[in-house]
Amino acid sequence: MEKKTITVLMVEPHRHPYLKTVEHTLESLQAMVGGYITATYPWEDPVALVADDDGLYKQDYEWNRYIDDYHFIRGNFFICGLGREDFCDIPAELARKYAEMLWMPESFIKVGGGLMVIREDDGSKPYV
């Protein structure tokens, strides 16, 4: 029996996003984010942002990306497509769109009671 795979846009702290293909199993998806998964849907496109369920609260996870006022993500996360009942491959055009949006890694500095985001522009361009 052929194993099913899923291709996602992987986003790690201090790295550019990249496409990654893994087995389409709960265990493989959990391994990519380092724990139990949770999905959020911050955009109108048919994609999910999948992260560690506890990632926002674990102090030992590095800050990764600022998505919007409600989504400061810690640790690894990935973006995948949405199928009828499950996650699916991220479509190529959406992989390009979100690779461009999240291309620059970010650093976070605590300032007063909040966080300041510094984008790490190395001059490279998305290749997804």
Show which residues each predicted segment covers.
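Domain-length accessory/inserted modules outside core catalytic folds
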Residues: E2-V128
